[in-house]
């Protein structure tokens, strides 16, 4: 039986084969999907162990974990728990938002290049997506974006801040003005990397019911395997979303892990500080390695950097043979790759291997 017409013509979200799971993982440095490079907080490990021994594993998960929702609201310092809902990661939140707020005739605007799953999901259900492309330096022209919204009659705009894959953070006041000035457009602000910047539009959700923020525990909190995230939005939107959202979808172990992580915020903050230091040192190394300028986008504020190289496939393959997995982004940005940032010790090892590559190639050649 054939898939429906939308799926037949869909360009899928391009993931990568996970060779890591088919090899020995003891000597691997996974820097391809922007996960944390350290284990979760010891609080998380201990809480999971306790639940495995004493919890009701034969029950469905808590469908309205008020304690966890309150903890998240407290963490935001802006709202109460009526503005929060849990999801099994940001992806499922994006999928639910598309299904709840859009009709087939609506148009989605996507600030690109960006995380591509939102586009894939929308196209998969027959909704048109239109890209608003950043300039050559990956800067965002807000006046042009507002014109684009009106000209294309955009119903929903997806904006990742900080941007993935560039790591750039956009002017938060200009984002807020855009949301306030366009009350008939739904804005999805993907704040997956919020912890690395502390910049948010969360203070707008009480006054603006055209705003949904998506966040995740997969990055700074080191809970990627648990697949848990949350949205922040006006209670009216939460009510609409919960008409479709499956309340049993977030596993109990994931809820336990998220709650424990929020009880040890210092662990997360220490890791974020370490990554910030490692990123600055790594970018400094890259800039000394290259000649001719350009190529290294040193204004990333997140836990990754985007770099370019003339022989990007060769570069990615070389690091993979050394047990370092990074993300080839050539399908979206020609001859570019994204490298997640770990600890200073980890990135020192990566720098050593990149230096070996450059020596073999007679330099680190930019495009």
From Swiss-Prot:
InterPro entries: Aminotrans_II_pyridoxalP_BS, Aminotransferase_I/II_large, PyrdxlP-dep_Trfase, PyrdxlP-dep_Trfase_major, PyrdxlP-dep_Trfase_small. Pfam families: Aminotran_1_2. It catalyses: dihydroxyacetone phosphate + L-glutamate = (S)-serinol phosphate + 2-oxoglutarate. GO terms for biological process: capsule polysaccharide biosynthetic process; nucleotide-sugar biosynthetic process. Keywords: Aminotransferase, Capsule biogenesis/degradation, Pyridoxal phosphate, Transferase. It comes from the Bacteria. Coiled coil: none annotated. One of its GO terms (molecular function) is transaminase activity. Belongs to the class-II pyridoxal-phosphate-dependent aminotransferase family. This is Dihydroxyacetone phosphate transaminase Cj1437c. It comes from Campylobacter jejuni subsp. jejuni serotype O:2 (strain ATCC 700819 / NCTC 11168).
């Amino acid at each position: 039986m054939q898939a429906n017409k939308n799926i037949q013509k869909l360009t899928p979200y391009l993931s990568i084969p996970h060779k890591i799971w088919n090899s020995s993982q003891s000597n691997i440095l996974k820097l391809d999907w922007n996960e944390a490079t350290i284990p979760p907080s010891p609080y998380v490990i201990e809480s999971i162990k306790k639940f495995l021994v004493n919890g009701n594993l034969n029950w469905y998960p808590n469908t309205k974990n008020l304690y966890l929702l309150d903890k998240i609201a407290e963490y935001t310092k802006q709202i109460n728990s009526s503005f929060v809902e849990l999801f099994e990661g940001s992806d499922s939140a994006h999928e639910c938002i598309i299904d709840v707020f859009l009709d087939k005739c609506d148009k989605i605007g996507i600030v690109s290049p960006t995380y591509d799953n939102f586009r894939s999901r929308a196209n998969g259900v027959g909704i048109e997506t239109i890209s608003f492309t950043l300039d050559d330096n990956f800067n965002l022209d807000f006046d042009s974006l507002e014109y684009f919204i009106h000209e294309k009659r955009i119903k929903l705009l997806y904006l990742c801040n900080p941007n993935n894959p560039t790591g750039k953070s956009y002017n938060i006041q200009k984002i807020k003005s855009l949301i306030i000035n366009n009350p008939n457009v739904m804005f999805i602000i993907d704040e997956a990397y919020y912890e690395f910047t502390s910049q948010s539009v969360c203070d707008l959700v009480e006054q603006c019911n055209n705003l949904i923020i998506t966040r995740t525990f997969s990055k700074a909190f080191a809970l990627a395997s648990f697949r848990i995230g949350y949205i922040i939005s006006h209670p009216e939107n939460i009510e609409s979303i919960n008409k479709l959202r499956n309340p049993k979808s977030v596993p109990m172990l994931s809820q336990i892990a998220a709650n424990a992580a929020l009880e040890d915020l210092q662990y997360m903050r220490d890791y974020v500080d370490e990554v910030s230091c490692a990123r600055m040192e790594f970018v400094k190394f890259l800039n000394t390695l290259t000649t001719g300028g350009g190529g290294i986008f040193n204004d990333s504020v997140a836990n990754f950097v985007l770099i370019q190289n003339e022989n990007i496939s060769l570069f990615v393959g070389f690091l993979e043979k050394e047990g370092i997995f990074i993300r080839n982004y050539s399908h979206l940005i020609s001859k570019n790759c994204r490298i997640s940032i770990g600890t200073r010790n980890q990135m020192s090892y990566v720098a050593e291997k990149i230096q070996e590559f450059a020596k073999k190639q007679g330099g680190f050649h930019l495009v």
